[in-house]
């Protein structure tokens, strides 16, 4: 890499939910019955100095409960590209929904990074409401609380620095404490949006995903994503199958599974 503090970014697809329609992915969907599958990802951010993981995904047990399909558990994909889960120094948790914080105990030596607002939300009075706690798994939340008590959680309030060239930024709406990650690469500043925009169309057409706490905040967060990135083409959504079509695979063996996000798009 030309810059010692530029990073390689890898999107690791570990699962999918094929049986979805547009009504599942957009508020007030126009063609509500048309198929609209989503993929499940975790992301690796690495250079010669460090390896950082964004989100931890979920396991086969959770997949069975939720009717999702898992091809590989995230740590299996990490191992496939030579990354030992125990060697990861930092894990950024975008938010505490089941598909982003479900295998926390697989990373025994990592420091976890979370927004204050997300922990408050996931452990506070909002969880008295069935509709708000639906995307959470209480066991995952309790695991994070235990990590707080063991000194392994760094809390951020709004903007925060993880390492040179890697920062987090609050983008609430889908969840109260959702954060995105801004990463320096040789092609510019890439923003890993996670669920701040599930699909490209959510933010490009400003049409929020229907699991939402605050629609106004979601719309403001779309603007924030674009402001943080070098261009809107540098914003990477959290669940869009198009990501694997718009970026090249790490190598021929990982086609459709592990793709690079720090290089120019293919479209």
Predicted features by range, described:
Residues 68-114:
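Active-site metal-binding motif and surrounding structural segment of the metallo-beta-lactamase
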Residues 27-31, 62-69, 128-131, 206-211:
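Short glycine-enriched, charge-decorated loop/helix-capping segments at active-site entrances
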Residues 1-53, 58-60, 224, 249, ...:
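Zn-dependent metallo-beta-lactamase
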Residues 2, 72-83, 87, 117-170, ...:
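Metallo-beta-lactamase
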Residues 68, 72, 76, 180-182, ...:
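Cap/insert and terminal regions of metallo-dependent hydrolase folds
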Residues 11, 42-46, 52, 157-186:
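Core dinuclear metal-dependent hydrolase active-site scaffold
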Residues 14-15, 56-59, 96, 117-118, ...:
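Active-site metal-binding loops of divalent metal-dependent hydrolases
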Residues 91-101, 171-178, 236-242:
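Histidine-centered catalytic micro-motifs
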């Amino acid at each position: 890499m030309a810059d010692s503090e530029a990073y390689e970014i890898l999107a690791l697809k570990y699962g999918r939910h094929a049986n979805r329609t547009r009504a599942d992915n957009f508020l007030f969907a126009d063609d509500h019955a048309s198929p609209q599958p989503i993929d499940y990802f975790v992301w690796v951010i690495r250079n010669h100095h460090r390896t950082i993981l964004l989100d931890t995904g979920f396991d086969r047990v959770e997949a069975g409960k939720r009717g999702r399909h898992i091809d590989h558990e995230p740590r299996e994909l990490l191992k496939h590209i030579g990354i030992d889960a125990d060697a990861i120094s930092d894990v950024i948790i975008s938010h505490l929904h089941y598909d982003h914080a479900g295998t926390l105990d697989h990373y025994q030596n990592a420091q976890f990074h979370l927004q204050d607002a997300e922990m408050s939300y996931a452990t506070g009075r909002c969880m008295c409401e069935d509709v708000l706690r639906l995307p959470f798994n209480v066991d995952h939340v309790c695991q994070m609380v235990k990590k707080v008590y063991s000194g392994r959680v760094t809390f951020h309030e709004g903007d925060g620095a993880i390492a040179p060239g890697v920062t987090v930024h609050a983008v609430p709406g889908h969840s109260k404490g959702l954060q995105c990650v801004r990463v320096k690469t040789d092609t510019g500043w890439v923003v890993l949006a996670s669920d701040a925009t599930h699909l490209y169309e959510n933010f490009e057409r400003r049409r929020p995903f229907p699991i939402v706490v605050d629609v106004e905040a979601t719309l403001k967060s779309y603007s924030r994503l674009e402001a943080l990135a070098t261009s809107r083409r540098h914003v990477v959504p959290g669940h869009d199958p198009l990501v694997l079509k718009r970026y090249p695979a790490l190598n021929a063996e990982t086609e459709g599974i592990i793709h690079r996000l720090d290089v120019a798009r293919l479209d």
